[in-house]
C-alpha cells in the first residue's frame, strides 16, 4: 500500500469529522507504553508526516498505515443504513491504543474489536446488510458479525484472535466459533482466525536494517502465513471427527 501524505492528511480530517458527527470523541491521553499508540497520536502523525530514522519510527509507520486503511474503510460506508451499529465499536476503539510490535494482552478488547469493524465495513461496502454484536454489552455467545438477507441471518462470522502457538488452543477457538455460528440461526458461517499477533514485526523489519524493495518483506510475510495455514489445516484434519459432531 502506498499512501501520499497529503491524501493521508485529508483522510484523517474526514475521519475525525465523521467521528465527531457521531458523538465519538478521541481523548488525547498520554502514551500508555512503548508498544502502544493512542489513536489521536496516529492521526496527528498522518497529518504532519513522519520524521526520523526508520528504527525509531517503525511503530508509527506501521500504526499510520493500519489506521489509514481502517479509516478509509469506515468512511466508505458512512452512508450505509447500518452504519450506526459501528458507533459503539468506534467509541471503544478511540478510547484504547493500537498494539504494534508486541503481542497484545489477552483482554485487549480494543485490539480484538479492530477486525470486527474492518470486516463489517467490507461487507457494508458491498451493499450487505449486517448485524454487529455489541462490543461491550454482549455475553460472547453470538458471532461477531452476521450478514443478513432480507433481515434474516444468512452468513455468520466468528473471529478468533490467535495468541498461542499450541494446537489445542486453535482447536478450542474453532469449536467455540462453530458453536456461536450454530446459535445464530444462519445457514452457513465462517470461523476466521486473526493471526496478526503470531507475526512478529521484527521478522519483517529487522532492527538496524531496511529493504530497498517491498517485495522482500512481503515474501517473508507470505512464508509466515503459509506456515500458519499449514498448522491450521493440520488441526482441522486431526480433529475432523470432533468437529463433525458439533
Ranges and model annotations:
Residues 135-138, 150, 160-162, 196:
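An acidic- and aromatic-residue-enriched active-site/binding cleft used to recognize and process polar
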Amino acid at each position: 500500500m502506498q499512501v501520499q501524505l497529503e491524501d493521508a492528511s485529508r483522510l484523517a480530517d474526514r475521519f475525525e469529522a465523521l467521528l465527531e458527527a457521531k458523538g465519538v470523541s478521541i481523548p488525547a491521553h498520554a502514551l500508555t507504553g512503548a508498544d502502544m499508540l493512542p489513536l489521536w497520536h496516529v492521526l496527528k502523525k498522518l497529518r504532519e508526516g513522519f520524521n526520523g530514522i526508520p528504527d525509531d519510527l517503525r511503530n508509527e509507520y506501521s500504526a499510520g498505515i493500519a489506521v489509514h486503511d481502517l479509516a478509509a474503510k469506515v468512511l466508505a460506508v458512512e452512508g450505509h443504513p447500518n452504519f450506526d451499529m459501528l458507533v459503539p465499536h468506534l467509541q471503544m476503539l478511540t478510547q484504547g491504543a493500537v498494539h504494534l510490535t508486541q503481542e497484545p494482552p489477552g483482554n485487549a478488547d480494543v485490539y480484538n474489536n479492530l477486525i470486527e469493524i474492518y470486516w463489517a465495513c467490507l461487507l457494508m461496502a458491498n451493499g450487505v446488510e449486517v448485524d454487529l454484536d455489541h462490543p461491550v454489552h454482549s455475553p460472547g455467545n453470538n458471532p461477531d458479525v452476521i450478514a443478513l438477507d432480507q433481515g434474516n441471518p444468512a452468513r455468520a462470522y466468528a473471529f478468533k484472535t490467535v495468541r498461542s502457538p499450541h494446537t489445542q488452543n486453535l482447536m478450542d477457538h474453532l469449536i467455540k466459533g462453530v458453536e456461536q455460528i450454530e446459535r445464530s440461526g444462519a445457514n452457513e458461517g465462517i470461523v476466521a482466525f486473526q493471526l496478526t499477533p503470531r507475526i512478529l514485526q521484527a521478522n519483517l523489519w529487522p532492527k538496524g536494517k531496511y529493504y530497498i524493495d517491498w517485495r522482500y518483506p512481503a515474501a517473508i510475510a507470505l512464508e509466515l502465513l503459509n506456515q500458519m495455514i499449514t498448522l491450521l489445516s493440520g488441526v482441522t484434519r486431526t480433529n475432523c471427527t470432533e468437529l463433525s459432531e458439533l
